[in-house]
Curated annotation (Swiss-Prot):
Gene Ontology BP, a term: toluene catabolic process
Quaternary assembly: Monomer. The alkene monooxygenase multicomponent enzyme system is composed of an electron transfer component and a monooxygenase component interacting with the effector protein TmoD. The electron transfer component is composed of a ferredoxin reductase (TmoF) and a ferredoxin (TmoC), and the monooxygenase component is formed by a heterohexamer (dimer of heterotrimers) of two alpha subunits (TmoA), two beta subunits (TmoE) and two gamma subunits (TmoB).
Short name of one Pfam family: NAD_binding_1
Family stated for the protein in its record: Belongs to the bacterial ring-hydroxylating dioxygenase ferredoxin reductase family.
Binding note for cofactor: Binds 1 FAD per subunit. Binds 1 2Fe-2S cluster.
InterPro entries linked to this entry: 2Fe-2S_ferredoxin-like_sf, 2Fe-2S_ferredoxin-type, 2Fe2S_fd_BS, Beta-grasp_dom_sf, Cbr1-like_FAD-bd_dom, FAD-bd_FR_type, Flavoprot_Pyr_Nucl_cyt_Rdtase, FNR_nucleotide-bd
Secretion signal, residue range per the UniProt entry: none
Residues where FAD binds: 146-149, 162-164, 170-172
Function text: Reductase component of the toluene-4-monooxygenase multicomponent enzyme system which catalyzes the O2- and NADH-dependent hydroxylation of toluene to form p-cresol. Ferredoxin reductase catalyzes the transfer of electrons from NADH to ferredoxin (TmoC).
Protein name listed in UniProt: Toluene-4-monooxygenase system, ferredoxin--NAD(+) reductase component
Record region (Ferredoxin-reductase): 95-326
Domain spans labelled 2Fe-2S ferredoxin-type: 1-92
Amino acid sequence: MFNIQSDDLLHHFEADSNDTLLSAALRAELVFPYECNSGGCGACKIELLEGEVSNLWPDAPGLAARELRKNRFLACQCKPLSDLKIKVINRAEGRASHPPKRFSTRVVSKRFLSDEMFELRLEAEQKVVFSPGQYFMVDVPELGTRAYSAANPVDGNTLTLIVKAVPNGKVSCALANETIETLQLDGPYGLSVLKTADETQSVFIAGGSGIAPMVSMVNTLIAQGYEKPITVFYGSRLEAELEAAETLFGWKENLKLINVSSSVVGNSEKKYPTGYVHEIIPEYMEGLLGAEFYLCGPPQMINSVQKLLMIENKVPFEAIHFDRFF
């Protein structure tokens, strides 16, 4: 085990050579800045002041080459090779309620929702604990580790993931096409979790496989007997995925699902409004002011919706919770 110490003395923890600095800090239940845990966002940047690390992904998009030359690294993409002294660059926004743990699961079933997106149902030996909205790191030996969000309410030892097979994506394609009986998971991770109070209406906005955490959060609210309006905007270019959304969310009178097709070809009968999600929301915006907003999808979608909410409609930043898929 190696000792990790930050220059401001706020972060002091131990890490072994098999753990990233980020995972080790979160296992120690420390407040540490991060978002994607996949090298894309750059939220977990550190400056290495003393010691040596193994950089798992030198070309990670979350870190510019000039920053690497300044001895900066991503905590989610480096492992310690010695005792370290570090400087944490960004300010942490909050603490997750469940420290991540490694555990084994058995693949119970796989159900395709479209040609590209599928649902994996897993079963662990122990109770799987997480907050609705969080994700898990899924390891496929020799191929890599990827982050996938839980798509079910907390339910004993079962866990449901929704995965989108990405062209040339080694992990997602292996999960889609191969018969895999067991999977190693690490989690939960993520700070964009369900925070809605009983007196506040809730709005969920997702694109593609970003639907997964929304299904978890919405169905949790339904199970809890939440009575305020729930509005879901879901965008996809595949009609099969829009149809799947209608079955993934539990039914309740206060739930309104608005599917949006981003493809005219995939919306041949024009069953759904065509365009991007952020282009459809304005016609509903007047009735949504004062809500808590939850966003999940690719960075471009998140940025467009944030602009719509904060700049054009003055929604406070504190009322917007987002998870960007990189």
